[in-house]
């Protein structure tokens, strides 16, 4: 199932890339690409390595249902706090980066998808070894967003639909995930902020590892957009996406 998701991660961007570059101007596509790079960092913060540390916690607790519910609640609270911190950081970036400031509506809409990812609980389904849930929700999320993009995005005036449709796809995925949680009879129970803070400290090493290995992919785009026009971001981003797609195959 996870192999299927790996294929989907290649296919969906390759479907939208030629379409968006055709219907959007170079400048608008540069905005799309730059905000996407920013959101990759926001997503790293919100994930904070819980895909690894959270999965480990779920595996250790899966034979104790009450403890399992507590682990889910504690990690959820920690990720909500991370999302709040990421949003504050994003507001700071909007204040100092002209490209984001000029497209504040687009940027804030794009963050909605990052926030909704808090409620996807991939670490839980990995921990209980139900990988098919992760794959199905990903395909549903990206499939809906991709299909709606072809329907609603036809020119620069439709640019706000790009993050909005991503958010719609994510919302559908969240609903599907909560249906699966109900099937597992999981009721989320929050403990305390101090417990959530402990979860963050335990997961920091995984976050640092992820940051070191994956963050640099978007760093060049981030720096280019901070100092150069959106058109330069667009050209750079298209090249990097094509290179990334080829590298994924090997």
Show the residue positions of the predicted features.
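Transmembrane helical elements of multi-pass membrane transporters/channels
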Residues: 1-14, 141-145, 162-181, 193-250
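Hydrophobic/aromatic positions within or immediately flanking transmembrane alpha-helices
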Residues: 3, 30-33, 76, 107, ...
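Alpha-helical transmembrane segments of multipass membrane proteins
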Residues: 14-18, 91-92, 122-123, 146-151, ...
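Membrane-interface helix-loop junctions in multi-pass transport and translocation proteins
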Residues: 21-29, 95-104, 128-133, 139-174, ...
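Interfacial transmembrane-helix starts/ends
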Residues: 33, 66-81, 200
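Alpha-helical transmembrane segments of multi-pass membrane proteins
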Residues: 45, 84, 91-95, 99-124, ...
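Helix-loop junctions and terminal segments of transmembrane helices
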Residues: 47-63, 243-250
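C-terminal transmembrane helix end/exit motif
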Residues: 54, 121-132, 153-154, 170-192, ...
């Amino acid at each position: 199932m996870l192999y299927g998701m790996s294929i989907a991660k290649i296919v969906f961007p390759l479907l939208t890339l030629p379409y968006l570059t055709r219907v959007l101007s170079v400048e608008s596509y540069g905005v799309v690409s730059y905000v996407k790079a920013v959101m990759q960092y926001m997503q790293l913060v919100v994930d904070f390595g819980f895909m690894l540390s959270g999965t480990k916690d779920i595996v250790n607790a899966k034979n104790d249902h009450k403890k399992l519910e507590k682990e889910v609640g504690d990690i959820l609270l920690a990720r909500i706090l991370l999302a709040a911190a990421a949003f504050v950081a994003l507001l700071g970036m909007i204040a100092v980066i002209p490209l984001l400031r000029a497209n504040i509506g687009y940027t804030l809409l794009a963050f909605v998808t990052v926030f909704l990812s808090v409620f996807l609980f991939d670490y839980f389904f990995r921990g209980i070894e139900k990988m098919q849930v992760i794959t199905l929700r990903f395909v549903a999320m990206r499939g809906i967003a991709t299909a709606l993009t072809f329907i609603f995005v036809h020119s620069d005036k439709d640019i706000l639909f790009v993050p909005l449709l991503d958010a719609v796809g994510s919302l559908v995925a969240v609903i599907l995930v909560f249906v699966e949680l109900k099937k597992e009879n999981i009721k989320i129970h929050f403990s305390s902020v101090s417990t959530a803070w402990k979860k963050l400290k335990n997961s920091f090493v995984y976050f640092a590892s992820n940051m070191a290995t994956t963050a640099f992919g978007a760093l060049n785009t981030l720096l280019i957009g901070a100092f150069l026009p959106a058109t330069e971001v667009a050209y750079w981003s298209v090249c990097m996406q094509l290179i990334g797609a080829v590298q994924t195959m090997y």
